[in-house]
Swiss-Prot record:
It comes from Mus musculus (Mouse). Disulfide bonds join 97-189. Residues 49-57, 119-143, 222-244, 293-313 are cytoplasmic. Coiled coil: none annotated. Its main location: membrane. One of its GO terms (biological process) is G protein-coupled receptor signaling pathway. GO terms for molecular function: G protein-coupled receptor activity; olfactory receptor activity. The gene is Or2b6. This is Olfactory receptor 2B6. InterPro entries: GPCR_Rhodpsn, GPCR_Rhodpsn_7TM, Olfact_rcpt. Keywords: Cell membrane, Disulfide bond, G-protein coupled receptor, Glycoprotein, Membrane, Olfaction, Receptor, Sensory transduction, Transducer, Transmembrane, Transmembrane helix. Belongs to the G-protein coupled receptor 1 family. The lineage of its organism: Eukaryota, Metazoa, Chordata, Craniata, Vertebrata. The chain crosses the membrane at residues 28-48, 58-78, 98-118, 144-164, 201-221, 245-265, 272-292. The keyword Glycoprotein applies. GO terms for cellular component: membrane; plasma membrane.
Length: 313
């Protein structure tokens, strides 16, 4: 009997770190702070990119998509986590668990596809600067963004169905902070070897394949930067890519450590903490990285502030 047939209105217990209650208040403060900073930082990028004509370029169009992903990413997990950290009953409804599972998978896969798209944009800008406006035209940008979202959500539909159709035989205690596939597979009372193999295949496809494309793009970018004669030109070219490289390292580095590092005595806690990093900390750091390391964004934000104050006066 599937999850849906067993309990549509039931609840699931999210253990989190309930065996270490002294961690709950510090984690509540950290997650609440991260949530506020993430909301403000990503909304800032979305508004500035939309309102400032100088940022109406493919690079900032894709950055806006990344900010939307990060906003949704953190919103589908953190509010429920904050409630559970301050509650005696650490539960999530069946419907809430399904939504959280679906969105977490969809947004993670979408970001996996979008990051190599952003590296392709940087590749064209630096390696084919004279043809940039011809290659990265508006229609192509819209198509690339749409494909990223479609692939991400399509993958989520498939994995969610495969996970939710498994019988759980009355098991309802999830040893995690959130409803994630590996944690949910442990609730099943049947052999899940095939599901684990499918999850591994999907992880390889959505992590190693995009990462290989990104590294290939940056190999060509690095070669092109080294050919630039002026130090100022090299610095400017490197500056446009360094923020994206940091974001890529944070996202793929932590995600890969979950699925590809061999099991260890600390694997249980690692599987809990790493999703928190790429699902909460990374969305908070992304706008900070792009804002603090990007002169165009900082200048655009200053112009926006001036416009707001001038309009009030």
């Amino acid at each position: 009997m599937s999850w849906a047939n067993e309990s549509i209105t039931g609840e699931f217990v999210l253990l989190g770190f309930s065996d270490q209650p002294w961690l709950e208040f510090p984690l509540f403060v950290v997650f609440l702070t991260s949530y506020i900073v993430t909301i403000f930082g990503n909304l800032n990028i979305i508004l500035v990119s939309h309102l400032d004509p100088k940022l109406h370029t493919p690079m900032y169009f894709f950055l806006t998509n990344l900010s939307v992903i990060d906003l949704c990413y953190i919103t589908c997990t953190v509010p429920q986590m904050l409630v559970n950290l301050r509650s005696i009953r650490k539960v999530i409804s069946f419907g809430g668990c399904v939504v959280q599972l679906f969105m977490f998978l969809a947004l993670g896969a979408t970001e996996c596809v979008l990051l190599p798209v952003m590296s392709f944009d940087r590749f064209v800008a630096i390696c084919r600067p004279l043809h940039y406006s011809v290659i990265m035209h508006q229609r192509l940008c819209l198509q690339l963004a749409a494909v990223s979202w479609i692939i991400g959500f399509g993958n989520s539909v498939w994995l969610s169905i495969l996970t939710l159709q498994l019988p759980r035989c009355g098991h309802y205690v999830i040893d995690h902070f959130l409803c994630e596939v590996p944690a949910l597979l442990k609730l099943s009372c049947v052999d899940v070897t095939a599901n684990e193999a499918e999850l591994f295949f999907v992880s390889v496809f959505f992590h190693l394949t995009p990462l290989s494309l990104i590294l290939t793009s940056y190999a060509f970018i690095a070669r092109a930067i080294l050919k630039i004669q002026s130090a100022e030109g090299r610095q400017k070219a490197f500056g446009t890519c360094s923020s994206h490289l940091i974001v890529v390292s944070l996202f793929y580095g932590t995600a890969l450590s979950v699925y590809f590092l061999p099991p260890s005595p600390h694997s249980k806690n690692r599987r809990k903490m790493v999703p928190l990093f790429y699902g909460i900390i990374a969305p908070m750091l992304n706008p900070l990285i792009y804002t603090l390391r990007n002169k165009e964004v900082k200048d655009a934000f200053k112009r926006l502030i001036k416009r707001v104050f001038l309009s009030k006066n």
